[in-house]
Amino acid sequence: MYHLGVPTGAGDHMFVVRDEHHQTAIQKLKDSGFTQAPPDRRAAPEIMEFLPDPQAVFDEINKGYERLDRYCTSFQFPPRLPFSGDQIFLIPNSFAHLPLDNLGIPSNLSSQMAQPKQYEVYGNLFYPLEAALVESFVKGVVHDIEEVGYSSWQLLLNAWISMMRGYLEVNDDILDNCADERTAQYGGWDLRVSKRLGSGKEMPVDMRGNTIS
């Protein structure tokens, strides 16, 4: 989202690869000095030290990302790299659901065809544009609801969708051409700004600055 203009601030590094390349990518990261490690979602040490049972809290946090962790592989950056201390998630596309239309053609034509529609292409890196990224997030929500019912990962995906709606002015019709009916019907996002919708304390403008009638 950051490359599209959404001020994400901080977060983990996430790379999506085709399923058939997933194990090869894992090995290449290991060969480059990356250490396979479970996701580190602990709160700051000054918070953890005051918890009566920090491990129980940590386990409860991870429970909300159970489906993500089951499909993905996480690594620690090696100390020699600028992002030392950060983590990277390697995600198979069967989980991410990024559209792969026009990507199975020769590389000299791939960037020309994929860039205007779905991706910005830099060498062998494909940065998803708005439609591809929203489709990926929405499919993630739909599949998460089907498999686990409710999760922190689902809430995070919805938050990302909301940020794209606000900062990039992505509209409900961005999914109209999606072949997956459940994804195409997803929408009706609320643009009101409040921590508690329905409390009567919503701001008089939506997240785009438009007056709410």
What residue ranges belong to the model's regions?
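Metal-dependent nucleotidyltransferase catalytic core
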Residues: 17-62
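Active-site nucleotide-donor binding segment shared across nucleotidyl transfer reactions
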Residues: 1-13, 17-26, 213
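Generic structural motif recognizing short loop/turn segments at the entrances and edges of beta-strands
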Residues: 11-13, 32, 46, 71, ...
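Catalytic cores of NTP-dependent nucleotidyl/adenyl transfer enzymes across multiple folds
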Residues: 51, 56-213
